[in-house]
């Protein structure tokens, strides 16, 4: 078992859309479908409290576990290990949202949390760490829980959302991106992949060279926000 927690993993590296990856995505998708199929049961106070508590535990537990693993294996670095990616930030904000039921956090995370978690789940930057390594397991628990937490709050909540909320979220993401770019320059880091593309396969590979892939990613982000907004309006009719 020790080999599944070591940083020098002697196993097949992670392959995008391998059998293990597809099965993991299928499990998360099935859980999402079950949330909607059993939404009347999920809305019951006892069930909703249990699910919110469960996801808070999974979100924080997976992130704390990841940070402990990074430190224990001497992989932790201020340039790579701070929770500054949008998907990582969404983990902590999702935990706060589940506890407080904040409308503002829900609106922000419905766009950013779902959008970033889908991208992270579909094109994870895992390098050599394939299933059943602890890095793989913690990664998918973390980002899968963000995705499912946002869907859970969409099901049990009565939040109203207009186009203004969409554009405020776009503005906040861009302001955050500028701050992260400055941090990247200061640390020599690559948070949010603003200075170069990630090493593994990702959507950015088809969006052109730096800095044009950032402009293309911005357009895709806005388009995806509109799709999520449209789906939410249909669901809440």
Swiss-Prot record:
It comes from the Bacteria. One of its GO terms (cellular component) is plasma membrane. Disulfide bonds: none annotated. Pfam families: TMEM164 (PF14808). The keyword Membrane applies. Keywords: Cell membrane, Membrane, Transmembrane, Transmembrane helix. It is found in: Cell membrane. NCBIfam families: intg_mem_TP0381. This is Uncharacterized protein YwaF. It is a multi-pass membrane protein. The gene is ywaF. The chain crosses the membrane at residues 16-36, 53-73, 80-100, 106-126, 137-157, 167-187, 212-232.
């Amino acid at each position: 078992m020790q080999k599944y927690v070591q940083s020098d993993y002697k196993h097949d590296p992670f392959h995008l859309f391998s059998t293990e990856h597809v099965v993991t995505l299928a499990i998360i998708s099935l859980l999402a479908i079950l949330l909607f199929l059993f939404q009347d049961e999920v809305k019951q106070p006892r069930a909703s409290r249990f699910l919110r508590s469960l996801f808070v535990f999974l979100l924080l537990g997976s992130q704390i576990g990841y940070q402990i693993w990074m430190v224990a294996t001497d992989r932790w670095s201020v340039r790579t290990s701070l929770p500054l990616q949008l998907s990582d930030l969404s983990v902590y904000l999702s935990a706060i949202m589940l506890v407080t039921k904040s409308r503002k956090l829900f609106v922000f995370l419905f766009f950013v949390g779902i959008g970033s978690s889908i991208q992270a789940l579909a094109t994870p930057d895992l390098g050599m760490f394939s299933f059943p390594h602890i890095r793989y397991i913690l990664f998918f628990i973390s980002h899968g829980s963000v995705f499912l937490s946002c869907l859970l709050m969409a099901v049990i909540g009565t939040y109203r959302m207009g186009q203004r909320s969409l554009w405020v979220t776009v503005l906040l993401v861009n302001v955050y991106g500028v701050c992260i770019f400055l941090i990247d320059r200061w640390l020599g880091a690559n948070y949010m992949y603003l200075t170069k593309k990630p090493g593994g396969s990702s959507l950015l590979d088809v969006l052109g060279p730096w800095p044009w892939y950032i402009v293309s990613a911005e357009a895709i982000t806005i388009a995806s926000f509109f799709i999520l907004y449209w789906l939410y309006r249909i669901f809440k009719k």
